[in-house]
Amino acid sequence: VSSPLSVADFDYALPPELIAQHPSPERGGSRLLHLDTQGRLHDRMFADLAGQLRANDLLVFNDTRVIKARLAGHKASGGKVEVLVERIVEADRALAHVRASKSPGPGTVLRLADRFDVTVLGRAGALFDLRFPGDVLDLLQAHGATPLPPYITHAAETEDDERYQTVYARAPGAVAAPTAGLHFDEAMMQRLEDVGVARAFVTLHVGAGTFKPVQVEKLADHVMHAEWYTVPQATADAVARAHAAGGRVIAVGTTSARALESAAAQLQGDGQAQPQTPQTPQPPQALRAAQGDTQLFITPGYRFQVLDGLVTNFHLPQSTLLMMISAMAGMDPIRRAYAHAVAERYRFFSYGDAMLIESPVAPALASSHSAAPGPAAV
């Protein structure tokens, strides 16, 4: 009997100098580590991605836009505060992380950016409910800073305002970029179109929880952070079309993957990950439009419903994202891939290089088309 998975199963040693502090000079100039259905590794360039895809494949992108969610300020007492907006709930109200020497209580007024005051209305779990003196998005755009990840050590610069945003970002609301998408420029989008690769979009507003390591030992005890997502009907239809034509559905980023799999989980009626036990085979249902908060936590043993593959960056040790890619490719293939990436000095995390992971098994909703060739990785 295998023992339950623990966080230690997803640890690896990373020399700090491999954490990319700046993007590569060109968007498409990164390297691409390709893990195929047989568990074999291929060192490629990201510019070669189109050569690994074929007509009728579908790439699904997350069109969320990073907001300038970070604001510095002070309390009336003069104490410093740092605010990171996590979610805009009304035009003039937001839930935010607040860093201060002492937690501000309801009614506290915070002076932000030396320009405007926000009022603390109360708490919502770890977040603070803040009332802004006008449109939150407008105020952030004018006075906020791009919220770079904690492992990027320089303050946000003009370069980051552009490069920590995908070229197709449309729906404002994320506090972290869907980083797999940062490698795509207009020329790459055109090349993919030229080889007959279809594209579709989902929206998932990435929260700051994406950087949080799992803080319990046993995965079963972890409470996954919630993120808001939407999968439009046009995207659900594109998934069905791709699978019907024998194409593969490949998510660009773990956030796109989470949105698609969350929509599939809603077909089962609960919007959560399905129990990780063999289930009675059910006739495949077509994916439908879906939206809402998702707390889907994908770990090894999960059967993907929609995805045949994933384009993704390298993830932090012990992170839920490393667990998700291990669910797709198998734990050993991912361990080998990461050891190879460290040895070959790939660049890691948000501004780093990418992986193309091809799933060794076909997704459940595509059981009308044949499984990907090759043995399943375990």
Task: Give the label of every model feature segment.
Residues 1-378:
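Surface-exposed, charge/polar-rich loops and edge strands
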